[in-house]
């Protein structure tokens, strides 16, 4: 879909709980694209998902109207919230003002899941699209909703974009009995590209850059309270505090970001050991300045990436079979003689 300045690719928008960890999102700033548009993408990469295109027509609502919130993944009723007076027209993951929101689930620390929360990540996306016009307004709507009604889901990375700006926001709950969430949102520079793929990506937070960074007031203090962080504010990493790396996070998630980045930055091979599972190595940046501008077709190609041209090329390993097929059946891991392998 191409509309005046924001381009969004969406596919496989119905997620089961097991497949929520199979999403990839790419972001392109307006000065990093060939036509000056902001671009984001969204896909849940699995053979057993079926795509849907949602539509909420614009509407006016009477004073005192309410809205039932149903978990997007499962259809479970979560609660009721106040409705606003007017809601915008939404098709898929974009509204009439060309605000678009997508996500990838990183999960994070299990003890931070709040089973009493009302706002799950899917409802948060689609309700916000009905209520906000810009990316900055969307961030406020989303964070206000979880503060008032509680956050039900695990950790999420959201792509939030309008015709002018692209943002990455990461959010995780506070655990049972504690309403709200801790979160941080960082604007992607106009001349840069970013990506996320089911692993928290925000490291140090530029606390003094109020124009390009927004965060919950307790994002650091809550981590200290929970024993997740003990250092100085300047050394705080959202990822390290709320979603520590493991092998799957690097090999299965950060590797997807790396394979996209390396198409536009010749220095990315310095992170090869990192994405192969060595968490002691320096992590990749949240965004990079590409060596050339990206077109819509480049983003489409990035979403079809199978690590071609790298040691991880999925058409060349044992799982590809005799026909060199890059696709893998779920689950992605299997055990032989007690040893676990990734397919």
Language model regions located:
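Sec-dependent N-terminal signal peptides
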Residues: 5-15
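Catalytic cores of secreted or luminal carbohydrate-active enzymes
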Residues: 296-318
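Substrate-recognition/cap regions that form aromatic- and gly/pro-loop-enriched pockets
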Residues: 320-343
